[in-house]
Structure formats: C-alpha cells, structure tokens
Amino acid sequence: MDFTRDDNSSDERENDVDANTNNRHEKKGYHRHTNEQIHRLETYFKECPHPDEFQRRLLGEELNLKPKQIKFWFQNKRTQAKSHNEKADNAALRAENIKIRRENESMEDALNNVVCPPCGGRGPGREDQLRHLQKLRAQNAYLKDEYERVSNYLKQYGGHSMHNVEATPYLHGPSNHASTSKNRPALYGTSSNRLPEPSSIFRGPYTRGNMNTTAPPQPRKPLEMQNFQPLSQLEKIAMLEAAEKAVSEVLSLIQMDDTMWKKSSIDDRLVIDPGLYEKYFTKTNTNGRPESSKDVVVVQMDAGNLIDIFLTAEKWARLFPTIVNEAKTIHVLDSVDHRGKTFSRVIYEQLHILSPLVPPREFMILRTCQQIEDNVWMIADVSCHLPNIEFDLSFPICTKRPSGVLIQALPHGFSKVTWIEHVVVNDNRVRPHKLYRDLLYGGFGYGARRWTVTLERTCERLIFSTSVPALPNNDNPGVVQTIRGRNSVMHLGERMLRNFAWMMKMVNKLDFSPQSETNNSGIRIGVRINNEAGQPPGLIVCAGSSLSLPLPPVQVYDFLKNLEVRHQWDVLCHGNPATEAARFVTGSNPRNTVSFLEPSIRDINTKLMILQDSFKDALGGMVAYAPMDLNTACAAISGDIDPTTIPILPSGFMISRDGRPSEGEAEGGSYTLLTVAFQILVSGPSYSPDTNLEVSATTVNTLISSTVQRIKAMLKCE
C-alpha cells in the first residue's frame, strides 16, 4: 500500500511538471502578424504614431488583434524608428566630421605653405603677424587721438565741418533696360547741365507756406559706374554655402504646409509661425518687423523660359515692371549651363510700388537655381553683403531671409509656381505714410500675392503680344490695319506702363502738404533731366498725389476708363468727348487693353491722339496715357518705324486696395488708394541754367488739384 501511494504521488508530480512545462512553452510562443495586418499597422503609424486607447481598440477590432498587441506593436515600432534615425544621424555626423577634418587639414597645409606674393618666399610667421598687428593698433590709437584733437580745435575756434556734402541732388531718368540706364544723375552748374538750387527753383509762397523744400540725400552712383571688386575664393565658397542653406530652407518652408504656416488673423492669408521658425531655422536678423507670405499660381509660360528670366536681371525687371524698379547682375558665381543642376548670381534689385509715399526697398541678393528633380526647379534668394556698395538710401531698411519660388513644369507649356516672400523690415528708419500703412503691414505691398498676380498678368500679356499671327476677333483694330501696327502699339503701351511705374518713385521730390484733408497726401513734385531715347529730351517736372476713396477699386477703374465722362476730368480732351480709334486686349480679362483715343477737337493744329494702356488685377490696377501728335500716332499705327524711338511722356493713375479687411474681397475691398501723377516737359535739351520753374510748379500743382477735385466730385466722394 505504501509503495502504491508513493507511485501515485510520483505520477501526479510528473503530471504537474509536464503541465507547467507545457504552460511555459505556451507563454513563450510568438504570434506573427499577417502581411495585411502589418501593412495596415505601418500605414496607420505614418498617420498617427501615438494612438490613444480608443484608437487602439478600434484598430484591434479591425485587424482582429487585442489592444495590448496593438500597443506593444506601436511601442516596438517607435523604438525601431528612433534607433534607425539615430543611426542615420550618427552616420551623417561622422561624414560631416570627416569632411571638416579634411578641410582643416587642407587649410593647415595651405597656411604652412603660404608664400609672400611680392617675393615668392615664405610668408610671415606667427610672431611677425602679432608684431605687425600691434603696430597697426598703435597707429590706429594715434590717429584717433589726432582726430579728437583736431575736432576739439575746430569746435573751440568755430571752424567748418570736416566733410563737405553736396546739397544739389542727382536727378534720375527711367531706363528702357532696367540695369543699363544712362539717364543718370548729373550735377547742374554754370554750364548747360546745371540746375538751379531748390531755393531758386521754387520761390514765392511755396517755400514759406505749405511746401517742404528739404533737399533729399545725394543718391548713389549708377551701378555701371561703381567699382565692383572680384570675389575671392573664400567669398565664393561662403556664398555657395549660404546659397545651399537658402535652397534647403525654402524647400523646407514649402513642404511644411500644415506645421510652419498659419492663417493671418487679419485676412486669412498664409504667414510663417514666428515661434516655429525660430525653433527650426537660424535667425539672421531680429531687429525689425518680419513679413512672410506664400501664394501659388499656374502661368502660361514654359518652365525653362521662366528660369532664364529669373536669372537674367534685365528680363526679370521687364517681367515685373510695376514692382522691379532696377535690377543688375553684379557677380556670376558659375557658368550659365542649363544642363547643370545648380548656378548662382549676385543681383542688385530695387523694388517700388504704387505711390511716391511707399518707400522703395533695396536688396543685394544671392539668387540660386537648383534642379530638385525632373521638371522641378527651386530658385532661392537671400540677402548678402558686399563691401563698398552704394545704395539710394544711406541705410538698408530691409533684409531678405531665404525666399524664393518652386517652379514645376506642366504639360502644354504651363508652369506651376509656388512663391514665398520672407523679409525683415526696419520701420523705425523709414516709416510708411499712414495711407499705405495698412497695405504694407498687411502683406499686400511687397508680398507673394503681388508677385504672383503680376507674373500671371505679364505672362498673359506676352502671349497676347507675341503669339498672335493675325488680328484677334476680340480686338477693335479700328485705324490699325496690320499685325505689325498692332505689335507696335502693344510695345508702346508696355514701355509706357514701365516708364510710368518708374516715375512713381520720384526720388528728388518737393512736397506740397495738404491744407485740411485727412485722406490726401498732398502733392509731391520732382524734377529731372532726360537724355535718353524713349522720352522727350530736356527738363521734366513730375508731380503726384495720393488719396483714399470710399469705393472699391473696380469701380474707380471702370470710371477712369469710361469715355463718356472722360472729357470732364482730362485736360487733354479740352472739354470735348473722346472716341476710341483702336483697342487691343492684352490678357484674358477684356478690361486689360491698350488703345488709341481721339478727342473730337476741330482745330487741326491742336488735334492729337492719346495712347492709353490699362490693366486691372486682384490687387488694383493702372491707367497710363500719353498724348501724341497725329504724325507720331500715324507712324506708330503703321508699324513702319521702331517703336522704341517714339518719345512718350506718360501720366496716369495707380489704383490699389487699401489693405484693410472687408467683405468685398472679390472686388478688391471697399476702399481704394488712388495715386494721380502727371509729367510736364518744361524745356528742351538746350534749357537755360537760370530757368525759373515756379510757373511750371504752379501749373502742375493746379492741374493735379483740379483733376483730383473733379474726380472726387464725379464719384460723389467729397
């Protein structure tokens, strides 16, 4: 019996051991997910790497897995991804470390083997360099002491200033090719090139009353006359590195749609989140107000042609005539080889828009084009510094952070353009006028939207101007009977718009301040001498005034284009109605036209025609016009002469939304900023140095004032 009981106990223990062993094997068993489950889990992980309990339960029901299995899979996946990223980062850091180490070795070799350029021997040693540096510091301290001693002596004995600043300003003229203008400042003295001082030009009540005759600062030398030193090898390397960083940053900004960009609280446009930007990118300038914007447009132009225009300063200025006032390529960092993948330029550009009240912006930018993939190119801009460069302003008011465009080639000659503008503006130095403050602060001034709207319009104009084999049906050719005549008129209109937009800067201006109105800027008068083809040679007085109207821009634009009422405000009509002699559409919008107008003047001696070019876009519009005698108009209409030789002196109107948010977004807002500008030829090339411009100033002041009052009365905005 005892042996039987022992045997039974032994059997039970063996059974228990076998059961425990089986349970242990069952606990250690692995469950492999199916390929469908893994694919679904990985897809979900890309969208949400940290699902909550509810999401895990739903996903488990979908895949027939327990929530705990889902939880453990996501934990393992996150650990695996983190490990993979760390390995990739370590590999990149090791490669960068090796690269830097090799660069240091090459620099050390170069320093050890440096030679003296004059004699070809070994360069100075470390001790010689320190001795020379101490000598320079001692000389610098001595010169500072001498400067202080002489300055104190002059102050004590009433001496004059140590530097002489020329008071007479240079006077500019517009250029047919933005960066090659020869109509540059000339000092006018006792010779035929001397212009009287402002105090002798404007006498009488203007200097004592409501006219500001403070002489502006002396402008810079023309770019073609400035001495640009060749870039050293180190400067080229530094610029190429900056260009690479700019391309990378702009590409990241475009790809980070949801995280980096947010909607503006003012007008729902996309702006960069400053907090995230400081987190992801290195700040280059924090002393100012950042402006950022992004816009996308599809234009009818081949991507290759767009890239060529962006990299050629003269073509760039012609493509954006109402924004780019001047542009010039300063340095080419590599050869223009479109089969290559990357090429860079150093470009000077001056931007100006809408009104003399809007301060221009000057940049020295590094522009880089890089092919990202097939049919996709990135063009990035970033501010760069060159020594001994003269600007119109004695101090820059803007710095361009990495900005640019992504160009994607589309079928049938179209291109998709994604535009990013990111600048830092120092408003403390040049504060914009209150009329345009909302426009500039809201981003509608120099923002991406203005660039894309202008790009779309000018691309359409190029198509309508150059790719038309015969007179289109939507044109009203009238007196123009040939396609050559049409092309001549279109070219004249384009040049007139460009010259009118250039004139708006009015660097050398004198102000008539407003007497009482709060929505008027007063009248600004500028004087310049023109010596180049395309405009009448001689002394020209230009004047402009800006005002706010409680009407949408489209209504103001249609009013200025209305021929039935034009004779009531246009002095060129002499009170007689005008008819349309010819009209050509310049874009998909039938309101954008270039036309010849003919006032019904009976006297054949005073009979003339008016060339008018006008456009309207999402941000405003422009109406520019110039009078022509019948012989000149007939020559332009025939197309038998070069249109660039026909002199044009345009006047007109700049129309803009005011930048304030409104419900009438489709019509450009409920308020309009209108700038009226006229030009008068005072005398021909042989003007007298004693010319008194008081009569001309009075005439143009009266002309501007009366035109503004008539327009306001007709629009019932008094």
Swiss-Prot record:
InterPro entries: GLABRA2/ANL2/PDF2/ATML1-like (IPR042160), HD (IPR001356), Homeodomain-like_sf (IPR009057), START-like_dom_sf (IPR023393), START_lipid-bd_dom (IPR002913). Residues 1-12 have a biased composition (Basic and acidic residues). Residues 78-152 form a coiled coil. It comes from the Eukaryota. Residues 232-464 form the START domain. GO terms for molecular function: DNA-binding transcription factor activity; lipid binding; sequence-specific DNA binding. The keyword DNA-binding applies. GO terms for cellular component: nucleus. Residues 1-35, 169-209 are annotated as: Disordered. Residues 176-194 have a biased composition (Polar residues). Keywords: Coiled coil, DNA-binding, Homeobox, Nucleus, Transcription, Transcription regulation. It holds the Pfam family Homeodomain. Expressed in anthers with highest levels in the tapetum and pollen grains, and chalazal end of the embryo sac. Belongs to the HD-ZIP homeobox family. Class IV subfamily. PANTHER family: HOMEOBOX-LEUCINE ZIPPER PROTEIN HDG10-RELATED, HOMEOBOX-LEUCINE ZIPPER PROTEIN MERISTEM L1. This is Homeobox-leucine zipper protein HDG9. It comes from Arabidopsis thaliana.
